[in-house]
Amino acid sequence: MKFGVVVFPGSNCEDDTVFAFRHNLGQEIVKLWHKDHDLQGCDFVILPGGFSYGDYLRSGAIARFSPIMNEVIAHANKGGYVMGICNGFQILAEAGLVPGALLRNIERKYICSNIYLKPQSSSTLLTAGLEDRAYKIPIAHGDGRYFADEDTLKQINDNDQVLFRYCDESGVICPEANHNGSIENIAGVTNAGKNVFGMMPHPERASDEALGNIDGRFILEQVIQVLA
Amino acid sequence: MLKQNPPYREWGLILMKFLASIDVMPIKEILDPQGKAVLLGLKNLDIQGFGDCRIGKHINMEIEAADKATAESIVEDACKKLLANLIMEEYTFELTAI
């Protein structure tokens, strides 16, 4: 199993992602430059957090047309695994690889804090093996308010495509825990094929004991336990 | 890929130049917190009478094309593929010859 993390101009979580996969999870991981057209044989591609292209126009809108995205989209369409974290999720949404869009946070503020997530889908690689509890994961975003129209929302709910919802410390999914105002507290979704994952929170920033929280590692480990 | 403007210059044709005035607005189903904040600010200034307020983007771009219809189809394409995200935004534009 080989992992690859795409580096766009303005990405800033690629090193955190490499550290989490290489040191915390013991996996082979390489960086992929956005101008290349080669996934270097990676089985699992990660689009990291950051501010690709300065978030100009809309978050992820320009990165979505980076050269390597042709290969990433082809990989996803063939059933290959792709995961987008934070800005990576925004890029996936702009590329149409996951349903919905990410809007400006409801209170208009950039939010950087630890929040709690409740795993939802019982049929995806990323969430099926997680415990039914609140996972403490950091968020750091200004445009994280998940939106999907009524039909799309029904479809992703019916098809078990919601990965995570924001919840409180005890695992209750309530309006108070919905910091960015996402529709139905949605923090992450997958595509219909369940091979593309997008989430706003940063599991890679909660993967090392030195940081005092390894809930993120439990999430990333799912991928390895099933695929390795 | 965006539609290419054919190589009119090489063919020796004279191109027309237009200013595309493009508005991109959040769709009505979406709550616009920026608009709400501006309304609140106006209220605090005691400037009265405003109702619903929505904030979007205005983009001015120059475009060269053989005629207005061609320019329109290129701008339309640019709006659909990049300038607006049709899940959350809608667009309108006007072309003026310059």
Regions found by a protein language model. Name each.
Chain B
Residues M1-L2, K28:
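Residue-level detector of alpha-helical hydrophobic segments embedded in or interacting with membranes
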Residues K3-L15:
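Short, Lys/Arg-enriched N-terminal segments with co-localized hydrophobic residues
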Residues G12-H58, E62-I98:
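Long, contiguous binding/interaction regions
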